[in-house]
Amino acid sequence: MANQSSAIESNPSGTSGVTTDSSPNKPKYPGIRLTCNGNQLVTQHVETRITDGGIFYPITPSTEGGEIYQQSYASGELNVFGHPKVAIECEGEHAAKGGATAFAVTGKRAVNFTSGQGIVYAMEQYYHAPGK
């Protein structure tokens, strides 16, 4: 414990945090430094990596999530399981929720980019999923 406290005190960058004994200038858990909003962070670093399909209706504030997912699909990126993605832009919230439900029923991981109002509007689609 004394080694870690001395590494913190001798950190020349002036930043606080736990450092490793082998490299006193670097934090133990440096993370990824970037500037983005919540839509960008979740879509780029989570949803495009773990899902098989992104189904959405472009409506503010969730439009950006669908656009980023489409860019990932267009560039041919694979998810962490090595599978290609599908990006589907629907004509309404009902269609988007129905598409995401159908995708999930077939055993695929799907994301539906929507807003609070979109969830309420497409609530009828939730009742179709059980029993299918």
Model-derived features: where do they sit?
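Thiamine diphosphate
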Residues: 2-132
